[in-house]
Each structure stands twice: as C-alpha cells, then as structure tokens.
Amino acid sequence: MAEVVEVLVPGGKATAGPPLGPALGPLGINVKAVVDEINKKTASFNGMQVPVRVEVDEKKNFTISVGIPPTTALIMKEAGVEKGSGEPNTKIVGDVPLEAAVTIAKMKLDDMLSYDLKNAVKEVVGTCVSLGITVSGKKPKDMLKEIDSGAHDAVLVG
C-alpha cells in the first residue's frame, strides 16, 4: 500500500525541515532527492505556497504531483503584494486587472465550485474583497455588479 504525504511548501524553496522532513523521514526514502525534485517542479511558483503530494510505494519509489497555489497567493503575486490588507474594507493594498482575474480563474477552474468561467471569475474577484485588492481600479463588489450586468462578457468568453 502506498503512503501519501500532502504538504504546502514554498515554491522552489522546499527544505528537509518541517513540514517535509518529519513526514518523509519515517518512510525510509531519500528526503534530499524528494526535496530536490519538488524544488525543480515548483520553481515557477517562486514565493508562493504550493500544494505538493508525494506518493511512496512499497519499493521506496516516489512520485510527486504539484497542485496550483491557492487563489489568494495567485492574486497577491499578480498584485505584487506580500500579504493582504488587515482592514480590507478601508485599506487597499493593490490592484489586479480583470484579465489577470480571468487568467487565475482559468488556472483554478477545476478546483472551484463554479460551472463556468464567468462564475469562476466572480469567485476570484470575491476573494479580492477579503484581501483589500481592487480589480481594474474598482472595488471588487462594484466589479461583481458589472460582471453580473454583462458589461465584461467579451473578456469572460472562455
């Protein structure tokens, strides 16, 4: 029976320390080899937390699958901010263009509850509310109203 370890690691910067080392050590595999491969596979997500799944079979062979970072991490990277606002209703920390929200929605579509791109984009824009990030210079709630009215349907065709 294969053992499975699921962790969030910093993209391209995983180490043999927690959370990976303690989880992989008891399985008797080369932790450094696993860490090196994870860092190769997650290098493009530098600076973001990335979900990683390591499967180890009975013969100590391992396979690594890398997920897509959380929506908040993708939005913050696009906005160029380190963390969201502590007061999202009053303090704005960044802005993302609607096109970036569409791109993020396309990346995350399989993991979302939405059935179509328009609603997935609304989920991403809704996440911007709690981060204190505007969308194309507008408050996220105003952008949601515009999306509902069909004002951006040309961008949302996917």
Curated annotation (Swiss-Prot):
Source superkingdom: Archaea
Keyword Repressor: no
InterPro entries cross-referenced by the UniProt entry: Ribosomal_uL11, Ribosomal_uL11_C, Ribosomal_uL11_C_sf, Ribosomal_uL11_CS, Ribosomal_uL11_N, Ribosomal_uL11_N_sf
Entry GO MF terms: large ribosomal subunit rRNA binding; structural constituent of ribosome
Pfam families named among the record's database cross-references: Ribosomal_L11, Ribosomal_L11_N
Gene Ontology biological-process annotations: translation
Subunit organization: Part of the ribosomal stalk of the 50S ribosomal subunit. Interacts with L10 and the large rRNA to form the base of the stalk. L10 forms an elongated spine to which L12 dimers bind in a sequential fashion forming a multimeric L10(L12)X complex.
UniProt-listed PANTHER family: 60S RIBOSOMAL PROTEIN L12, LARGE RIBOSOMAL SUBUNIT PROTEIN UL11M
Family: Belongs to the universal ribosomal protein uL11 family.
Function field: Forms part of the ribosomal stalk which helps the ribosome interact with GTP-bound translation factors.
The protein, known as: Large ribosomal subunit protein uL11
Originating organism: Methanospirillum hungatei JF-1 (strain ATCC 27890 / DSM 864 / NBRC 100397 / JF-1)
Taxon lineage: Archaea, Methanobacteriati, Methanobacteriota, Stenosarchaea group, Methanomicrobia
